[in-house]
Amino acid sequence: MSLLNPVLLPPKVKAYLSQGERFIKWDDETSIASPVILRVDPKGYYLYWTHQSKEMEFLDVTSIRDTRFGKFAKIPKSQKLREVFNMDFPDNHFLLKTFTVVSGPDMVGLTFHNFVSYKENVGKDWAEDVLALAKHPMTANASRSTFLDKILVKLKMQLSPEGKIPVKNFFQMFPADRKRVEAALSACHLAKGKNDAINPEDFPESVYKSFLMSLCPRPEIDEIFTSYHAKAKPYMTKEHLTKFINQKQRDPRLNSLLFPPARPEQVQALIDKYEPSGINVQRGQLSPEGMVWFLCGPENSVLAHDTLRIHQDMTQPLNHYFINSSHNTYLTAGQFSGPSSAEMYRQVLLSGCRCVELDCWKGKPPDEEPIITHGFTMTTDILFKEAVEAIAESAFKTSPYPVILSFENHVDSPRQQAKMAEYCRTMFGETLLTEPLENFPLKPGMPLPSPEDLRGKILIKNKKNQFSGPASPNKKPDGVSEGGFPSSVPVEEDTGWTAEDRTEVEEGEEEEEVEEEEEEESGNLDEEEIKKMQSDEGTAGLEVTAYEEMSSLVNYIQPTKFISFEFSAQKNRSYLVSSFTELKAYELLSKASMQFVDYNKRQMSRVYPKGTRMDSSNYMPQMFWNAGCQMVALNFQTMDLPMQQNMALFEFNGQSGYLLKHEFMRRQDKQFNPFSVDRIDVVVATTLSITVISGQFLSERSVRTYVEVELFGLPGDPKRRYRTKLSPTANSINPVWKEEPFIFEKILVPELASLRIAVMEEGGKFIGHRIIPINALHSGYHHLCLRSESNMPLTMPALFVFLEMKDYVPDTWADLTVALANPIKYFSAHDKKSVKLKEVTGSLPEKLFSGIPVASQSNGAPVSAGNGSTAPGTKAKEEATKEVAEPQTTSLEELRELKGVVKLQRRHEKELRELERRGARRWEELLQRGAAQLAELQDPAASCKLRPGKGSRKKRIVPCEETIVVPREVLEGPDPRVQDLKDRLEQELQQQGEEQYRSVLKRKEQHVTEQIAKMMELAREKQAAELKSFKETSETDTKEMKKKLEAKRLERIQAMTKVTTDKVAQERLKREINNSHIQEVVQAVKQMTETLERHQEKLEEKQTACLEQIQAMEKQFQEKALAEYEAKMKGLEAEVKESMRACFKACFPTEAEEKPERPCEASEESCPQEPLVNKTDTQESRL
């Protein structure tokens, strides 16, 4: 955690970008080329260009997906444009001057902005540096204050021809409520007419912040501020802010030595940064407005910034990582119809994906160029070489770590396969890994190389020919028809066995058995089952044999048909990869989850969507990540919830496309069951509490909104989804939700869990959301900037939330944890509670309901057969009549300590304090006004001053700071104006006091009613639970008694068989024992039932008495509050006169002589008078 020093700083804009450069912008569709000046604003928010007509166009840097220069940039197709740029001349240098910016809301809806510079190589620099700004992790994860600053920057750049900010731009920027925008502009003394304009000099950052505070007030932050600052003070001191940061904004699980708490000098730096008032900065004080901007700053980011960069160990074997993977990458729409595009390979790789899929099919004459398409569907084709070229360009723009090309090869032509291999070798060059690394040979038991070892490399996943002899070009593979298309008989898949295996007799025999079993299984399948299997797998089951050229490119990622987990463990080859449809993977996960996890510790697996997902929808990847599956492939063109989760999680670790699995999913000596509900070894479970407090600028319309909070993790994790109520009004600017926190009590593996927070309109329309891994969250108050469905940052919408994370502690150990944290405090409180309980109950029973023991012989000797008929039920009766501890009900003292009651009392105390503070302030205002009116009757130089006293929570009244010089005419005789002023002020003070005391009385009566109702509600809940527990215990004890009596019956029968061997005698004695047993059980049950009924009656009597006591308390406290009110009303007249005398004693010397008092001096001592303040008032609200 780095609260005071953010790990990642925002990107820096190079000087030449903000100064601008001349370009020609061209568009192929319109065939128009126009000169522009291209710039980036100094803060790096916008790329914008200005036409000769002074018209400006903006492009948000967060929407930029790629920049390209040279041969990878767009080339004009229009002949008119080609002539403009002299492209048909042989010595043309167009490729050295051009660059293209690609932007769009998702990977499919793209826009290409094409620019040509006047100088060579300028476009290259612009392309590289603009992409660096767009890809910087803090561009998309900026603080709330940064996103608000973006609005100001744009307003100041969109100027009218006169160089002013049009007011209509404000209405366009904040369209939800025009009246509120007008009111906020008026509050800042700015023009508000639609056709008006504002001078940029009149709208600096300070005015903009005031405008935002007027447009979007933050009462919820004011409440937080009030709870931590000095009472009745409009500021928070440095010490209070330090306490707030260390208590609320700091993760309580952190070690205080390794991560020391905030220090006052660090907090002073925060005050210097965020406090708008210079005077407060000098005094080390933070105002409520400063608090708002502090909570919007980067120091309070909801994310741990270090998780955004590469922070994980990248030297582990490749199969120890989750790998960002794509399915049918070339598709832009559905699986059955729609266009295919090589551009998708670029976009997917730019998003951080490290495994893309190429479905290769044989090209048609005359070119016979291999193509990529979805076989046997209506999707369009793209050339294989175009896809390879796109991959070569974009493979390592976002991440330097290895890219895996997953080939689904249906090209049955050796010549076309050779052409494919040649394209790969030529276009990928040295980045293509064709031979195993020296330290990681392809041998059983050897681990895979790490992402760091394979840095900058491209790996091919394709069938590998295991025979040393070259493939015959004239021989057609099995299962391929003359027309070149696969026949209905699927080609046998490679099992990943090497030529080395075939020299071993035992393994060879084993292979034959496996093949025979597969053939038998295939023969036993009926036609419908075969069709179903093919529909689930798509065309993956119809791959053809790999010929030598393609086979030679395969090394660490060799596909193999999955036989069984045992078979794979026996082979122990880490370079073998099996692919599963989501259905097959789910079946394996359901039947053998722990074996699946162990399999993924050793080698890699790939999961892909079932073939029936024609709409390109996705399955939830979480279940397969839980099993450790590395390549969980999804359809990147569909931005549904599974894809959103995938993109959100792989944004972390530097968007490298690799996330290190947890230790227990990597170590062979650890066992992990994804369906476990218990504690997992070496993992500390986490408890997460989230309170959704408010939202800001959620929608462009005035609508009611709600928030959904959802947890993704293991099946054994707690409740998955919560939802707030609808916002009270159709207010999308600053809605507030006053609800209890949502608690996820026991998150078993935080490293495998993530939190989704989504905002919806009343009708369910999506507004924005955010998905964040649990281990990347910070505790405290945070502004959560929302994202679109395609994970693009939204500038305006945000949520204000409170997060609290702590280590999970079971309820049974909660007291022990508290005791260990603060032993002295815990045992002191425990002793006090014990004393109170003893006073109420007289003793402290160890158990509320003790079990009813069944009597047994003291010496433990077996019962003889002759004892079976004597005194039936006597011992059972003795057992049933043994003394049972009477159950106790919850006492009044315990009810008062319940969380719900305590919380309500604290709220009431706060309300009373606020009421008293307002009354005291009104009293003081009346006295100050009277003093000011008196001053008007005197010389201006001799005015009476009032100042707040020190050392008090409330403001006290001090009569004067200086001796008042009274005019001669006032001393010689009473002035009627002064007397009228005195009478009027006395009457106002009397009315104010009566009104204040009535308000306090009414509020206290209301508080008493609410607290009594709360106690009654909790008491009834407790009592219902007590009765239920009592009945359950009674049933358990009865069953236990019957079991013991049954065991005694069997002991008697066994003892009897040892005494006599006569069958007739044995039957007779057995009947006697059984009859005696029945009588004993009946007597014991009857006696126990009577005892328990008596105890239940006593328990119900105690509960009724408790409820009556609670009801009686209401009347007592109402009477007490009324008595206090009457006493205060009686003393109000004297209190008013005393306040009047204290304030005007210097102005009325006659009164001062009648009641001598120490003269008023300009001292630091405060006046002893404290109007309307009763120090015990706040305590009296507690029952």
From Swiss-Prot:
- What EC number(s) does its UniProt record assign? 3.1.4.11
In this protein, the active site sits at 327, 374
Q: Which stretches does UniProt call biased (Acidic residues)? A: 503-528
Does Heme count among this protein's keywords?
no
**Where does the UniProt annotation place the signal sequence?**
none
Q: Where does Ca(2+) bind?
A: 328, 357, 359, 408
Q: Which GO terms describe its biological process?
A: detection of chemical stimulus involved in sensory perception of bitter taste; G protein-coupled receptor signaling pathway; lipid catabolic process; phosphatidylinositol metabolic process; phosphatidylinositol-mediated signaling; phospholipase C-activating G protein-coupled receptor signaling pathway; release of sequestered calcium ion into cytosol; sensory perception of bitter taste
Give all residue intervals belonging to the C2 domain.
666-794
Basic and acidic residues bias spans: 875-885, 1152-1161
Q: Name one GO cellular component term.
A: neuronal dense core vesicle
User: Catalytic activity, per the record?
Assistant: a 1,2-diacyl-sn-glycero-3-phospho-(1D-myo-inositol-4,5-bisphosphate) + H2O = 1D-myo-inositol 1,4,5-trisphosphate + a 1,2-diacyl-sn-glycerol + H(+); a 1,2-diacyl-sn-glycero-3-phospho-(1D-myo-inositol) + H2O = 1D-myo-inositol 1-phosphate + a 1,2-diacyl-sn-glycerol + H(+)
Q: Does the record bear Nucleus in its keywords?
A: no
Domain of life of the source: Eukaryota
Q: What class of enzyme is it?
A: hydrolase
Residues forming the PI-PLC X-box domain are: 312-463
What cofactor does this protein call for? Ca(2+)
Q: Which residues form the PI-PLC Y-box domain?
A: 550-666
Question: Which InterPro entries does this one have?
Answer: C2_dom, C2_domain_sf, EF-hand-dom_pair, PI-PLC_fam, PLC-beta, PLC-beta2_cat, PLC-beta_C, PLC-beta_C_sf
The entry's keywords: Calcium, Coiled coil, Hydrolase, Lipid degradation, Lipid metabolism, Metal-binding, Phosphoprotein, Transducer
State the oligomer form and interacting partners. Interacts with RAC1. Forms a complex composed of at least WDR26, a G-beta:gamma unit, and PLCB2.
Q: What else is known?
A: The receptor-mediated activation of PLC-beta-2 is most effectively mediated by one G-protein alpha subunit, alpha-16.
Identification of the protein by name: 1-phosphatidylinositol 4,5-bisphosphate phosphodiesterase beta-2
Annotated organism of origin? Rattus norvegicus (Rat)
Q: Which gene encodes it?
A: Plcb2
